[in-house]
Amino acid sequence: MSSIHSKVVIGEKRREMSSTAAGGSLPASIMANGSGKPIKMEMKPIVGTTAAGKGHGGLLPGSGDKHESWQMELLMERLRNKAKSSQYKSFQEMSKAVRMSLLEKRYALDAVEKSNLQKTLDSMQYCIKVTSRQGLVERLDCLTRQLGLKLSEDTSGLFISSDMFYLEIILDPNGTVQDVKVHHECKMKQQSCSELVSCLQRGDFVDFTTQLEGLASIYQLNAEKKIKVNAFVALQALETDLYNLYTLSTQHYNDIHSLLLKSPLGVVQKRRGGHAMKLTYYIAPYDLLDLEARKMKPLNTELISAEKIGYSVAVNLEASTANKLQIQPLLVQQGNSPVYSPIEKHNSTSLPATFVLRLNKPMALNVAMLKQIKHITGDSSAVTIDPATSNTCLMSLIVQHASNGTVNNIAKGLFVTLPDQYHCYYMTENKNLQGTIISSIPFTEPQHVSKILVFLRQQALFNQLLTSCIRNNGSSSTRMSDYEHLVVFEVAALSCQYITVSLEHPFEESIAMVEFDLRNILAIQVRVFCNGYESDERISKQVSLIVQRTMSIPVTLRGLMKIWQEDYEVKFKGQGNGGGNGTVDEGNFSLSMGPDEGGGNGPAGPGGGGGGGSAMNGQHNGSLNGSGMEFCDVKKVKLEPMDQSKKRRGVEDFCRSPKSSKVESEGGNEAMDEEDDDDEYDESTNLSSGDSNSLGENQQTNAGQSSSSTAAMGAPAPVSTVGPRNSVSGNASESSGNSSILGSLDFSSLDPDLMRSSNSSDLDDTTEVSEPEVKVKSEEPSYATSVSITPIGVGKSTSSLTNSVLNNIGLDKRPGIEIIPLANAGTNVPSSITITPIPMGSSGGSLKSSSDNSGDKKLSSSSSGSIHRKSGSSSSSSESDRAKLEKKKKRRHEEQLAQLQQMGPPHKILSKSTDGPASPSGSSRKFSVSPVPLKSGSGSSSSQIFLSSGSPGSGSKSSPKHSPVHHSSPKHQGSYGTSSPKHISGGSSGGGKPSMSALKSATSSGSPSSKNGSSGIGGSGKEEGSSGSGSKSSGSGGSSSSRDRDRDRDRDRGEKRSGYSSSSSSSSPKLKTPAVKLKQLDLTNCGSTVSAGVQLELMNSNSSGGSSSGSGSIDLTDSALFGIGATDLSKNASAAAASAAGMLLLQQAMKRKGSLSAVIDKLKSAQGGDESSLMLLPELAQQAGFSLKDASTPGKTASSSLPVASSSSASSSTSSTSVSNLTGASLGSASAAAAAALAAHFSSAAAAMQGKTSEYMVKPSSDGIKLTIQNKKGSKSGSSSSSTSSSSSKSSSSKSGTKPSISSGSLPPKKLPSSQSFSGAYPPTSGSSSSSSGKSFSSGSSSSSSSKAPFQKSSSSGSLSSSGSSMRPSSKSSTSSSGSSKDKSRSSSKSSSSSSAAAAAASSLMATNAAMAAAAQAAVNANALNVMKMLGLTSSIQNMEGFVKTLDTKFQIPKLSARSGGSSGSGPGGSDIEKLKQESRPLSSSSAPTTPLSNVGQSPTGSNDFSLPFNKLPGDVSPLHSTLLPNVMQKMFSGHDTSMLMRRSPNLDHQSSSNSRDGFSSIYGKGSTTPTTPTGSVPPPFPSPGNVQSHAMDFSNSSDSADASLMRPPSRPSSTMSNHSSSDKLIDATTNSNSMDGLRSTSPAQALAAAAVAAQLMNKLDNTQQFVAALKNHHHHLSALSLSNAAAVAASQLAAAAASASSGGSAGPGPVTSPTSVSVHIMKSPVPSPLPLHGGGGAASSSSVGGPDEDETLVGVSGK
């Protein structure tokens, strides 16, 4: 209690104190102080008052002024007294007093303050719910006051009045509105308005206000009251006429849609109270979406009236100058047609007003339309225009307006996310389409309205379609994971009635164009163009229905791609018919190879062009069933009834084609297990009997038989009915004279179903080529595929994988390698792939001769010989294989000699086509430029895909035609850069004959060096000789010994995967030739070579000297890498082959070694100087299009040479160890970079292991430059390699007779300009050279192995960073083809180093010191753009002849020393190599593996066909590439429809091949032949960022525009059309197609390499996003392949090293500094790299259309 009490006391005291302080005792204290007397207070005294008062008395007054204290105290006292006397008043009284005092107007109120006060009161009023009459009156009073009207209250109701009208509102006693009547001055009586009644009854005062405004606006005229009276009269007269017209139109247009879109006025709503008449003329489906129900609301007039949807105009009257306006209705109905009476005095009056159509929302209108509208209305008054938007580009204006200003730069991509697709749209501005924003349109007569609405409706439709590409959900655009699945589109408008959308065909390596014809708004027509031809009517109808239902471009394009996908799946299920019409112009890419042993010199027939048809072997008169068959699944193709010979051909596998049989019999192919043959025969028979009697399948399975049987018979067996297949596998081999390669293929291990699917597409691609090729080849020995890769333990489950793989490979099946993906384990289980080397009798010699034959020979001789040996021979006994190989060699040699005799003038077209079939580019495979190339795979990477050394073999064969020499030769230049027939036949295994020297070299050494020689020969006789000599002496010499050893090893290890080192070497030369000819072609040549072109030649450390036994070499690149491999491999090559074979090999290697890191460790240890060098060219390297070869020449060149060119000139072009030659050029550059890195890593290790003399030998090969780096200590290698590089390029250019740039590959000089870097024939601008250098780089590298000059050009292109500077010297060096092999080596080395800037980066890994020099050079061009170029971004474009042309001839390849790191590393043994291969392969696969598009896969034809590269790309290649590629392709290859890519239709393939000449597949069948240069080179064709895209990765050229528009698709649809149409006419287009193919194939691979290298090299996401995406794809692929972290790390390290090298940074990781002996075959990569994605700048654009929910709903409505 005490405590409580104390608390209370304290509380009391506190209160007392506070009250005192507050003044409770203040008055008393003040008074006390003031008066000196204590004052009595009425308040109860407070304890401590005195003290408090005294204490505070002096302080509180403040200053202590007594006077102030007195005043306050007196006042307080007065108040107290007053309150006391008056007693306290009530609150009401007080409040009233306050109010009265406030109302006293003592001060004048400020007008502003008064208005603000009124606004505040009004705002408060709006928040008060009207529940009584008084509340209603107050609210209406507030509204009317704001509108300037008067409100008066009467007993009966309320009146709202103005000077011209008044409203009477009748209320009941409760305040409920009963009626509202409107009375206008001009009217005699009031009119009841139900609209106003309803809005007041429901308390909608906002609407009531709007109606009052509408009524008041009628009279807002500057005139007297008596004049203004007529305003409402005139407006009513107009409304009467309009409604009468609408009533008439409803009789003619029964349904709401036609009424809305076709009737004169649309849907008309009469005036409702104060609401003006509304005309709705267009409604977008987006406005009808019911997001909750996920459906579309039914369109009807009630919905239009109830909801404010669509585009509409209100009919109003507004003040203006004086006009004569009607005061009476003018519409008179005469019959069924309305007639307007003229305006006269009696029916009109003059008013200072005009009628106006006020748009419900501002609209962007075309200025041309606005002028027409003004013309209609007589321009009585200016249309209301937003001055800020006057005369700006219409599309930009639409995008800005639709995005609410969030998107200001349409150069950035506009990202749209659909339920299952991710799109990026680039708007290509048309300067002729100027626009402005309008909000109203004045008019004076009723007939004007319908005419004005025609334009507004057209504009609304146009705006709606473009607006459908704009979204608010742009945040997702920045997610890199989306880039993998991103599909890029370019939207352009020729006028407001035509919108064109360009995209990359997902399945046909081409650009597709979708044209929206908006003239008939009710029935929009969509036309789809693929490969220059309009798609069938069915597709157009389906797409038209979708766009009519959705009015959305993204949803429509999604439906189109779904249709393509369905067709593609049906095709590969054998349900579809491949309808290819092979024409001589389109398909005649198979040049007569010269009379084969058993055949005459018939003119090359059109048979080569269509993959679907079968070409007659001996007669060259094979007619292709389909010109576009390359992209068609052969299984889908229904072959015409065949005569007996045709049937026989159909039954026999291409591997068993007569040529193959011959070669086999000669080469001992007869020794092939009969069981295998029988099995194969049965399989082939079954296949052929099946719906898919695709040449590919039948040929593959039957080819082995036929080749065996024919060989036994000694007479050329008719090519299997599957011409393309035969040409790819059998014919390619045959043309190579390696038909035995095909025969040697072990088809027994192949799954017939897989074969069927894979072959079908290959057949399609190769049928045309193969048959003509087969004719020639049949006479020549045909080589069975050396390698058969069959997934083991896979049931039918492989079908899906097979389909994908086959799709990729189908275009480009190579006889050399059969990779059959196991359903589920394509890449999982290394063991699931059996790689059986099949000994090829005359691997070297045959390869040579076959290289003379169009790409087929090239393929079969090197790739086919070695690869086929591998594949088929593995099952056969070693002795049989050896015997066969020897026989094949002899036959090849004979064939080559025959070819030389037959050489004659070069076939320009054939040259390209040659490349096409064998090389990755689509044209070769499409056309039987080289009857053999498709078979042999030299032209079509598929045949070369065979893991065995066959790839080199085929490379050799195709090499002559494709070899830099060929390309270099003026002839070759004349014809699409491969004008010389040698070029054509050799490089493409087409009609060109190898030079005698080449033949001699091929003949002299069956070893790889011989093959190299042959490939060198391919370009031109003397150049071949030179090249061959150069190759022999510098690279070929080593290569020869390697080749011999390889051969021996192949024989010994026939069952092993290793192919002949010689074969790989040879294939690389061949690849070179194609690569040189066209980078794409190079890829094709490498096709087999390129795809498989990277031959992992296991240079056994056991092997003496530089040429460790070459038998270890595995030519996986061609078909495996590019999916161009023969039969299955070719299809799978791009995805399955690369991923499966590479993956399996890599996995095997990993399993054997435990991991890639283990292999690398071994390699590193090998770097220590281990004598044994395992030149393991990872799949990446193969993809990059180089074969790993151990050159035995210790002094001259590195013991191991990587014929990068062999794998794919285009890929090589990517200039890394061309590991990335996966997709020809497309994957090639990225892949090459990665591969180069890997290869460099391995190579450095291998070099260290070998401890061979440190020398770099560069051999120009037809495909590119072959770098042989022999580095005892690693320091030496740098200088050596650089010297070799320059030497190689010199020799190459000199020999070919063409400028180095021309020699740089299949690309004709014209195309070469873009890849000027090839031989340096074309002086490149710094930027262009850099860009072209990316492509050149590959070619240069491959040329080092095969052809000297071509690849050197390519090499220059290849060296991304140093390509510009390097190229110059390289090309110069190329010119001296006759230089000693050392010189050649130097030239090659220079070219190679320059061209392989990326490779250099990889090389730098291998040889840090050597790489440093190259890196320094590379650093010059090391900027992001250069890096991209080096990576092959530019290569891809450069692959096209046009691009090649633009390349700087003088471009110098960085010294090999810098690049040597990029070359492959050597490993302890063949198994290691295989392991590395597998590892590398997965890596390369990874580089572009994520792209499932078959378009990524290399086409069988090779790099020529733009569409082919995608087909060739590994199936795993990320869609990003394809997505990006479409833009690039659009720009680069306007002719190549994406649809081509998408469907790989035979026509497309064929066309693209022929069109490729321009560097663009011709979409329209005739396109300007202007090559699309990367950027600088071919700016005219593709001035838009598209150029950059076409160089997708060519950052150097595109750096300026790359940042802003790298991702942009080409902006010249018209140019594309012209290019396409022009290309179609050109058979040379094959080369271009090849180049395009190469580009395609390169882009994924190069994207990989670029991704790896560029990711680190480039800081600009805009430029590097594509790389990043590619890199991501690569990593995905790696993880998918279950690559160990070590492998990934190794890959990344390699990439980093490559990046540093290319950037001119440190040479590379110390561990990889110096390979003992590295042979880098750098091939030109024609394939364009994927477009770099912009940072998603456009993604943020907001769209008026709406978000994902709306898109998803609309997708559901679209019906697709």
Curated annotation (Swiss-Prot):
Where are the compositionally biased (Basic residues) regions? 959-970
Q: Name one Pfam family in it.
A: Med1
**GO CC field:** mediator complex
Amino acid composition bias (Low complexity), ranges on this chain: 726-744, 860-878, 928-958, 1004-1014, 1059-1068, 1197-1218, 1276-1319, 1326-1380, 1388-1401, 1481-1494, 1567-1576, 1592-1615
Q: Where is the composition biased (Gly residues)?
A: 596-615
Q: Which GO biological process categories is it annotated with?
A: positive regulation of transcription by RNA polymerase II
Q: What is this protein called?
A: Mediator of RNA polymerase II transcription subunit 1
- Organism listed in the record: Aedes aegypti
